[in-house]
Every structure is written in C-alpha cells, then in structure tokens.
Amino acid sequence: MDVMKLDHDSVLKELERITSKAAEVQDNILRGILERNKDTEYLSKYMNGSKDVLEFKRAVPIIIYKDIYPYIQRIANGEDSSLITGHSITEILCSSGTSAGEPKLMPTIPEDLDRRTFLYNLIIPIVNKYITGLDKGKAMYLNFVKAETSTPCGLPIRAVLTSYYKSKHFQCRPYDPFNDLTSPIQTILCEDSNQSMYCQLLAGLIHRHKVMRLGAVFASAFLRAISYLEKKWSQLCEDIRTGSLNPMITDPGCQMAMSCLLMSPNPELASEIEEICGRSSWKGILCQLWPKAKFIEAVVTGSMAQYIPALEFFSQGKIPLVCPMYASSETYFGVNVEPLSKPSDVVFTLLPNMCYFEFIPLGKNGTLSFDLDDDEQVPCDKVVDLVNVKLGRYYELVVTTFAGLYRYRIGDVLQVAGFYNGAPQFRFICRRNVVLSIDLDKTNEEDLHRSITLAKKKLGSNAFLAEYTSYADTSSVPGHYVLFWEIQGHLEPKLMEECCVAVEEELDYIYRQCRTKERSIGALEIRVVKPGTFEKLMDLIISQGGSFNQYKTPRCVKSNSATFKLLNGHVMASFFSPRDPTWVP
C-alpha cells in the first residue's frame, strides 16, 4: 500500500478495515515481525530461530530500556542491524524525553515512515467529518526541526519529527487542499528555532484571513509561539508594512521563501495586526488575529493538560481544542476518532497495524495501583493482547516493533474507555515512571497534576499559574516535596500557603499518613520562580540536545541536575504548608 497516495475516503476505509479485524491484523503483525527478525541475535537468544507465536509469548522477556540499550549502542558503534532486526536501521531516533526528562535512543527502519505517514494521513479526514470547509483555506501549523548528530558509525541521530519533516513522505507529499500549510517548507527545515519561529509566524500573519486551523505538535510549543509573538509582533508588522524581511533572518532558505511572501509593502495588513496586538489584554487574541480558525490542533493530554486554561484564555474558549493522536519515538500508537471531545474526555483508538501491542494489568478490580516496580521482571503470562483488554481496567503499554523492540515497556499507563469496532480505545492516564517519593509515598504524574489543578484555583483572578515542576528534597530530615511554580500576576502570601495546603489535601492516603501520622515527610513547599524561568529551562534542555518541536517541561527534576540549579537560582519567594493535611485512619 502506497500511503502517500491514499485519498481521504481510502484512508478512512482502511481505518474501518483494520479496526474491524483488529485480532487478525495484530496476529499478522506479530507473525510478520517474527518471520523477518527470527534470525537476529536478540531473538535467537530466546527462540533459537523459531518464529512460533506461542514460543515468543512464552520465552521472550518483557523488558525496559536498559535491557535493549546495549544492543542499540552496539549498532550505533558500527555493528550490524541484525543484532535486533532483519531490516537495515537507517536512523537512531532521540526521544523528546519522558516527562521525567530522560532521553532515549530508539532504532528505526525505512518502513516505519510509512506507518507514521498513515497515521498522519488519518487526522484531517477524521476531523473533516466533524468540521467542514478546511479545504477553503490554510493551516497555520507550526513545525520545527532540530540539528541532528550522528553515531560513531555515522547513523544520523534525529528527533522523530525531524526524521519525518526531512523525509520524502513529508517533502514530496501530494498537494492536499485540506492540509495546505502557511509555513514554507524552508522555514520548517531551518534548524535555528528562533529564525524558524519568526518566519512561520510571519507567514501565518500574512495569510491571517485564510487560516482555517491553528496548531503545533504539543500545546507547549504552540504557547511558546504565542509568547514569542508577544515579544516580536512589532517587528513582524514592520516587515509586512515595508515588504522586507528583518535582517535578523540570515538563513538562506528562510530568506528565499519569505521573499516570495513579502512581494510588496502591505501597510493596511500591518495596521490591522498592530491594532489587535497592541490591545491591553490578549484574551481571545487567536480569534482576532485568525478570525476564520475553526480549531486548534495540539496534544493536550498527560503533562500537556495543564496548558488547556492558557489555550482557552488566548482563544476565549471559542476555538475547539483537537488532540489528534497518540505517539512516541518508539512507535506511533493511535488516533482520536472523536476530535471534538473535551480534552478531559479524549480517548485514542489504537491502530492494530502500527506494531504488536500487549498490556500489563495494573491493580485489581479496575483500580489503579502501581504494584509493579519499573525494573521488576514481569511474568510472560501476565500480559494480555490488544483485543483482550477489559473495559475500565488500567494497563501499562508494551510494544513489539519491526525495528527491534521486543515486548518493550513504554511506561505509559492507559485506561480502557471503550471500543471502536474491534479495537480498544484508551484514555492516557500518566507516565508510570514519574514519581515523587520521600518515604513509603509514591506520587505519580497524574496525582501531581490533579492536585495542582485543584490547588491553583486558590490563586484567584489576579494570578495565573504558567508552569510548574517538582522535586523531592531529601537534603533535610524529614524530606519534603518542593514545587517550582511560575506565576503571572500578584502574589498573596496567604493564598500561596492555601495552595500548599490544597495540594497536600489532594495527594493520596499514604502521603497524608506519612506527613500527618508518621512525620516522615515534611511540609510541602512552593518556590515561586521569576517570570521567564521556564523558558530559560526549555532553552537549557534544548541546548543539551533536546528537540524544540517535541519539548515537554520535565514534571520532576533531580537535585544534582542543571535544570534544578537553574530553577533554584531563579526563586523569588518560598511558601510552606502551614498545617498538616487531613488523614483519617
């Protein structure tokens, strides 16, 4: 199947086919992986050349990154791809990092691009079923690449999105009026994120009356663009007014591309934009700058959910948020077939043709319980197949890919929310390996996010929580949780103390027991950092090799890290919980 030639009807028919025959498709995927990869060093160690599915499930262990990393490292150093796959590994993908901030190197093969492209090609046809007229204008969808490095043997190391944007699948894709980007391809491929952002925003403003949808991969990237626009709108307007590009743009590709858009001065358009951007409040600014925009496309689940209030502020709640897909550097997973669902209700239909899926049950009787350590060996008979998951239950995702990951624990916790034909739909809950822990307590990303979401309401109307991360401070006895908050607006000490209390009240039973009865955890602390600190944090992480396009704020940091030092160096106020949280034996 040539995924680049599938029209909207064909790709939707294929979605129906693979989800209606999910069990059959999954069986074929696993058999195909074993047929091609049975002679690899990794599989031979467990299966002795067998391609039997039952033998695979009996003998091949369920692993985490540290188990497969030595093989990836050997390939990076020049050994043959046959260590783990029967295909040629052509790139190493550098993950954006989990919410814990740990990047990983993942093998990829050429046909992986076909699978990613198939998923991308589903998004607009699905959305078009609910939102019409997208072919009547353009999409201001902000894409970015980052400079690549290489392994000792010369394999490129790229972010997964950089890999896609540099591929023929993106650059040579057929024209689609439903997916006509405002950004010239040269601006997307510019490795200087500052110049790329400037030019892409300039292009979006030039086409402001044609833009039908807005977006970026992650909500954080889109909000970064708004922040950038707040600083640069005057210069952007000057470019439009004079018909000439700001001299700060030195990238030849950007210069050439933008010269085609800045053909002549347009003082009328510049004045329109100046009037809007010069207003005292930017509430609803997206509706005013791009009046025809019908939705904002971005990932707003998991750690991105905290950006929903900011997006709703800038859109005045008038532009729907569409969270289209669920993917990672390891493999792509699924799509949202109900794009207009509320962000809190988003579920993803896992696509059976992406890889072979398995699931580790978590907890009992449908409850969420992290009763399995990240590095604990999982019995082979504990996992269940894609089509055998149970409604309402929680699972950890496990994948087997053509590129050489076998029964690999992704680390994501999902809840079964329903079924689309024969394929289960999942709600993303959290990254299971992100925890704060002082004593017996274990606070995961979801618990932390929920607690902060409720607590920040105490700030009132004069302050706004812009960003946060956390840290388990064990330098004192007892240790305590520290939250770094960046707040826009007026700080009131009493309200900040109330926020500390509110966070603790929402943390789990064990935390409150340790805090109140056992006294093994000290009072929670909120350290308020200076405005712009989290932008500096992102700049730091990107300078260390992170991807701008895929950046996620780390939800916890370590005391000996550069990120912690940066955050702690920008603290301007500190507040502690003034009382113990409620705990009933």
Curated annotation (Swiss-Prot):
UniProt GO cellular component terms: chloroplast envelope
Its EC number(s): 6.3.2.-
InterPro entries registered for this protein in UniProt: GH3 (IPR004993), GH3_C (IPR055378), GH3_M (IPR055377)
Keywords from the named record: Ligase
One example GO MF annotation: ligase activity
Coiled-coil residue spans: none
Domain of life: Eukaryota
Keyword rRNA processing in annotation: no
Keyword Ligase carried by entry: yes
Induction comment from the UniProt entry of this chain: Not induced by auxin.
Function summary: Catalyzes the synthesis of indole-3-acetic acid (IAA)-amino acid conjugates, providing a mechanism for the plant to cope with the presence of excess auxin.
UniProt record similarity statement: Belongs to the IAA-amido conjugating enzyme family.
Protein name (Swiss-Prot/TrEMBL): Putative indole-3-acetic acid-amido synthetase GH3.9
Organism per entry: Arabidopsis thaliana
Gene name, Swiss-Prot/TrEMBL: GH3.9
